[in-house]
Amino acid sequence: MFLPTTKEEMDEWGWEELDIIIVTGDAYIDHYLFGASVVGRYLVEHGYRVGIIAQPDWKNLDDIKRLGKPNYFFAVTAGNLDSMLAHYTPQKRLRDFDSMSNEGIRKRPDRATIVYTNLIKRAFKGVPIALGGIEASLRRFSHYDYWDNKVRKSVLIDSKADILMYGMGEKSILAITKALESGENIKDLEINGTVVRVNERKIGDIKERYETKELPSHEEVVNSKEKYAEMHRKLMTMDKVIYQKVGNQYLVQFPPIYLTEKEMDEIYEMPFERRAHPSYSYVPGIVPVQFSVVTHRGCFGGCSFCSILHHQGKVIQNRSERSILKEIRKLLNHEDFKGVIQDIGAPTANMYRMGCKKGLADRCPKNCLYPEPCENLIINHKPLIKLYRKIRDIVGDDVRVYVRSGVRYDLIMYDEEYGEDYIKELSKYHVSGRLKVAPEHISKKVCKAIQKPDGRLFKKFLEKYREIAEKVGGIKEVLPYWLIAHPNCSIKEMIELAEFIHKNNCYSRQVQVFTPTPMTLSTTMYHTGINPITNEKVYVPYTYREKKIQKAICLYREEENWEKALEGFKMVGYKGVIYRWIMEQMEKKKKQKKDKNKKNRLN
């Protein structure tokens, strides 16, 4: 049974009023990979009445009023993606498709968190509003906004909401609900996993009672790129209460909340429908994930461009094997199931049961994997291999079980005891088409900025994976994902990547142009020209022209990219192997055209 989205559906639940109303920028998909569904179900499991308003019309008040006024508060999320990222390409062109909307038709506003909050304030004066989701989470402090090309204030201040939940949000939203139920004022709450606004007097009180860390003020980070870089450095650990001055008020972030294994199991075993609400004809976003299974949360990879660090965190939070296998059995009986489990994974598929042996991940500013794996890091694929085998025993030979989440190839290479066994399992039983990995780049200079191993380790992985996969009769093709126009990547580094691709036979059309998103290390480098970890200056490819050239060089095998790639080669005086390959292909095309014209004349 879906959570209610109309008064009629409230009647089906036997509810005359609601305690919490969730407003989301996504279509309502009742699946644990969609935040509104997870927190909604979690609150219902704890005895509260919850409704969902998905993608309300923001041009009038009728839609936002359809469920009435909640007893406690509205919870607002832009959806599974930052609304600006969902709407615009890296070249800031408007996208014409939104996979999280019915029929792919765009139905959310730009800066959805702010727009929805203002809509609620117009409709219901004085009702408390809590923000959540990835957009709010990563915009909780002052942040560089790529689309405005400026440093913006926290979305909590810009929206004038009452409280912001960062991270995954289940326990913090439950704590907020219980506090309001007991009569507390939302403006007085001090709950882990949240950010609040306070005045000068209150910040003094907080500093007396907590161990705190102060960020440079909003005014400082707007006017100084060095201060902005300092702010990022200070945000690399989250164990203390963190505060930032903004004008005459302060933002205060309380430490993150992590889930126990029991709590993880409770959340993922809730009775999700695993489909879009029946009011929709077709929501594309559910298709590739409908029968995916999450094994854990968090990622200690520390990629510079990734938002997971500041959202889910570095601490791996595992589900029990029992809970995962229980879900597998349940999937087999779902009426929509057609014999394929699309993914067994998480932000990084092969981090299940791994992590810091000292439990210090959230307090340690160091990268767990780069430049070398930390001595305190547990790297062991045995629990995952065991899990895969148990899943196959349950589903039998007629059901395909894939691993489509990202796999960290460096973790496999660092696991001397079970790395090769993991390759055997993966290639033989769990790869669909080609193994998807994300080296991102191979240049030492670029990989240092990205905080990933360079091409030397990836080359060794390619050789090892292909060799083992061939021996066991597995799928030996590898599909790399490449990232272009990242800070420290110039045309010379793109040529270096293209030559590596050519030499190692790992061409891929999976190429992404770097887009600066709030709160990431890469975005700090893009905005400041400084690597805040090393304090070194970095090269930043700002212009659309250079980004197009870099993309053309990476996709050098496509005929439509040859002229643009040659333009880039001319800029740096390059006449190496990729230049010669393109010239040979152009000559062949020219000869083919000439022969064809000659044949036509003879006819």
UniProtKB/Swiss-Prot annotation:
Domain Radical SAM core: 285-557
Family annotation (InterPro entries): Elp3/MiaA/NifB-like_rSAM, Methylthiotransferase_CS, rSAM, rSAM_horseshoe, UPF0313, UPF0313_C, UPF0313_N
GO MF, one example: catalytic activity
One Pfam entry name: DUF3362
Top-rank taxon: Archaea
Cofactor: [4Fe-4S] cluster
Record PROSITE patterns: RADICAL_SAM
Co-factor remark: Binds 1 [4Fe-4S] cluster. The cluster is coordinated with 3 cysteines and an exchangeable S-adenosyl-L-methionine.
Binding site for [4Fe-4S] cluster: 299, 303, 306
Transmembrane segments: none
Keywords, sorted A to Z: 4Fe-4S, Iron, Iron-sulfur, Metal-binding, S-adenosyl-L-methionine
Family membership: Belongs to the UPF0313 family.
Protein name (Swiss-Prot/TrEMBL): UPF0313 protein MJ1155
